[in-house]
């Protein structure tokens, strides 16, 4: 019998060899959990985000407006990685301090803002009230659709007010909740759906995001003010901003699709954001009543949406969204594909994103790109110091 005596050194070496694969696997797992290194200072200094020397915007720099230029440089460095981003603008203290265009975007491009148009429609409701076309947000919806009065089977529809519609609390469901309803949205024939579309909640009782509800708001403004929505909007809103609507799609009855389908340049979208940041005033002219702006930016439904990256506590006002990003309260217009007009009142800042609108394309792939726009803007805002 041969007796084998292992020294302590031999035992330790044997244990070490057995454990080595597990230790290496653990180390790799730990490294994978660490945040990736950000861009170097040299890379950030090479980023060019200076506003283009065209148009009527007053321009400045982050330094002149008290903002860390490296934070802005990192924003634009990250933006360059996004394959569906078109335009990215930052306005601080009323001045354009950063601007760049990517992929198919350009300063001349009239981008399809998708549902960010809803916030514009809300502004036109406020102006219609101010001009006397409408008398109150408590007017009933069916007052403006008398041709369907005899076709209303659900008596609750007679109680729907303009206020309910503005707050997305009219009782009409999200169209994507039912394939037949979704098909109706793309039919191009909308007015009669006031009568035909079913309610799924009592008016005023619950938030339900409905494209048709906003479109009917646009029809109400057009009928009350005796003008198509695009002409009215250009005359009473965008002319005052020295801005121009590129186009605004119409339905089969000739009404502009008030829930979306408007084309604006990124710079003109930024002017609209600046208008709301300044309580409806633009270059000394009160374009939208200040009280209307204040009412529009309140949160009447909270939460109105799940958190999106850094965007938490998402609420809804009069066709405007609200959220908290980091320590900063924000309001924002939001369209499919990642169109964003973000207002930071405490920092006197507007951020505009235009992107591939993914026209008639929905699902996980379009949402992945859309969320990337939220992540881009949200991480930048969260990095900003408090005012």
Model-flagged regions — what are they?
Residues 106-107, 197-203, 213-215, 251-258, ...:
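Flexible glycine/proline-enriched surface loops and loop-helix/loop-strand junctions
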Residues 76-80, 126, 142, 163-166, ...:
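Non-transmembrane alpha-helical segments in soluble domains
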Residues 112, 131-170, 196, 225-260, ...:
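Active-site helix/loop module of the DD-peptidase/beta-lactamase fold
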Residues 243-245, 297-350:
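Active-site Gly/Thr loop motif
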Residues 2-23, 27, 31-106, 111, ...:
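N-terminal leader/targeting segments and the immediately adjacent pre-domain N-terminus
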Residues 94, 111-137, 165, 217-221, ...:
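Active-site SXXK
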Residues 213-220, 260-281, 339-356:
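Active-site-proximal alpha-helical segments within enzyme catalytic domains
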């Amino acid at each position: 019998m041969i007796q084998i005596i292992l020294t302590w050194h031999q035992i330790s070496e044997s244990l070490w060899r057995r454990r080595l694969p597990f230790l290496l696997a653990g180390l790799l797992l730990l490294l994978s959990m660490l945040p990736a290194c950000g861009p170097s200072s040299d890379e950030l200094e090479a980023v060019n985000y200076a506003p283009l020397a065209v148009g009527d915007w007053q321009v400045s720099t982050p330094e002149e407006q008290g903002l860390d230029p490296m934070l802005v440089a990192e924003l634009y460095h990250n933006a360059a990685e996004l394959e569906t981003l078109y335009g990215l603008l930052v306005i601080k203290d009323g001045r354009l301090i950063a601007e760049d265009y990517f992929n198919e975007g350009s300063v001349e491009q009239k981008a399809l803002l998708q549902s960010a148009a809803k916030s514009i429609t809300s502004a036109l409701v406020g102006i219609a009230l101010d001009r006397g076309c409408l008398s109150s947000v408590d007017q009933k919806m069916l007052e403006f659709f008398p041709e369907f009065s005899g076709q209303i089977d659900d008596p609750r529809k007679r109680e729907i007010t303009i206020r309910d519609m503005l707050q997305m609390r009219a009782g009409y469901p999200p169209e994507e909740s039912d394939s037949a309803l979704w098909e109706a949205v793309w039919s191009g024939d909308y007015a009669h759906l006031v009568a035909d579309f079913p309610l799924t909640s009592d008016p005023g009782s619950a938030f339900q995001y409905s494209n048709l509800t906003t479109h009917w708001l646009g029809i109400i403004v057009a009928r009350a003010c005796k003008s198509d929505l695009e002409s009215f909007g250009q005359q009473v809103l965008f002319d005052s901003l020295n801005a121009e609507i590129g186009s605004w799609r119409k339905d089969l009855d000739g009404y502009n699709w008030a829930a979306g389908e408007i084309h604006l340049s990124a710079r003109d979208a930024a002017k609209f954001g600046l208008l709301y940041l300044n309580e409806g005033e633009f270059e000394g002219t009160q374009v939208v009543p200040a009280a209307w702006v204040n009412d529009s930016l309140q949160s009447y439904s909270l939460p109105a949406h799940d958190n999106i990256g850094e965007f938490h506590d998402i609420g809804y006002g009069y066709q405007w969204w609200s959220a908290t990003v980091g320590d900063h309260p924000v309001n924002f217009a939001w369209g499919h594909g990642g169109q964003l007009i973000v207002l930071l009142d405490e920092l006197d800042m507007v951020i505009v994103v235009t992107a591939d609108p993914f026209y008639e394309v929905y699902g996980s792939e379009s949402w992945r790109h859309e969320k990337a726009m939220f992540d881009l803007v949200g991480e930048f805002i969260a990095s900003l110091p408090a005012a």
